[in-house]
Amino acid sequence: MMAAEATAALIDRLPKVRGELVADAPLAPLTWFRAGGNAEVLFRPADADDLAAFLAGTPADVPVTIIGVGSNLLVREGGVPGVVIRLGRGFMNIEIEGTCVRAGTAALDVAVSRAAQEAGLAGLEFYRGIPGSIGGALRMNGGAYGRETKDVLVEAVAIDRAGKRHVLTNADMHYTYRHCGAPDDLIFVEALFQGTPGNAEDILRRMNEITSSREATQPIRTRTGGSTFKNPEGHKSWQLIDAAGCRGLRKGGAQVSELHCNFLINTGDATASDIEDLGEEVRARVKETSGVTLEWEIRRIGIRKERGGA
């Protein structure tokens, strides 16, 4: 746990908020892995104005980390120093604007795809296959089933570390595969997506196909962090992992999924270290057998606690 005195001193240095500040807040319940350490301070802003004021008033030396719904996130046992920001209800808005969909970045990807479908807007069906929030999709150029965020984004609204708002166009995001080139200190709060008029029943049919495909090929009903590694150019990570003999491989309470071996699973009592160590073992075996270095897609944050450490 974080040192109580240091945490109290940190909170004293933070500005007053309308949202919620929680000291030594457990983050494991906020991640799909259900493993990991605590945030020194967790901030849940009431809305974008609350977030902007908080960032403007927070000393520059205080580390700030933003998280979403935790679907593609691993929090190390040593915890996350400084302030962890998690956007909530004030950032879940979804509105239809002509042939566009405007969404807050805490809105779930599946909710955005559903809103577009109900409005008869095609093009956002792929979000049905991404188990995360819009903020994560913006930051990682989230994609599935042949489409990516870069294919549908019109603009994104963000707040920088000084509390200033910015509107970024698609080009400003400098998207590449599973990567956004926008400054790391920007916190996205809203996005506008372009749809195309379509038949609502046809759109729903495609979304249901995506759901069926996910259920048949991915361990979606387990404690998992989604796709573990990015696909290297010219390769599929799961094929490299399978060829390296890693399907079903275990370390502590962590396991490589038997169903889809680019997914790591918490079988019930895995620590964050179990999960990360298993991922590194997979990377080493793939490197040895194929010469390819896998790059993590799961975001890992916090301080690593060495085994046997206090």
Curated annotation (Swiss-Prot):
**GO terms, biological process:** cell division; cell wall organization; peptidoglycan biosynthetic process; regulation of cell shape
Catalytic residue list:
R178, S227 (proton donor), E297
SUPFAM superfamilies in the cross-refs: FAD-binding/transporter-associated domain-like, Uridine diphospho-N-Acetylenolpyruvylglucosamine reductase, MurB, C-terminal domain
Alphabetic keyword roster: Cell cycle, Cell division, Cell shape, Cell wall biogenesis/degradation, Cytoplasm, FAD, Flavoprotein, NADP, Oxidoreductase, Peptidoglycan synthesis
Which HAMAP family does the UniProt record give?
Answer: MurB
Domain FAD-binding PCMH-type stretches: 34-213
UniProt xrefs under InterPro entries:
FAD-bd_PCMH, FAD-bd_PCMH-like_sf, FAD-bd_PCMH_sub1, FAD-bd_PCMH_sub2, MurB, MurB_C, MurB_C_sf, Oxid_FAD_bind_N
Tell me a Gene Ontology molecular-function term this record carries.
UDP-N-acetylmuramate dehydrogenase activity
Biological role: Cell wall formation.
Localisation: Cytoplasm
Q: Which PROSITE patterns match?
A: FAD_PCMH
Cofactor(s), by name: FAD
Q: State the protein's name.
A: UDP-N-acetylenolpyruvoylglucosamine reductase
The gene name reads: murB
Q: Which GO terms describe its cellular component?
A: cytosol
Catalysed reaction equations from the record: UDP-N-acetyl-alpha-D-muramate + NADP(+) = UDP-N-acetyl-3-O-(1-carboxyvinyl)-alpha-D-glucosamine + NADPH + H(+)
Hey, which pathway is this one from? Cell wall biogenesis; peptidoglycan biosynthesis
Instruction: Name the species this protein comes from.
Output: Parvibaculum lavamentivorans (strain DS-1 / DSM 13023 / NCIMB 13966)
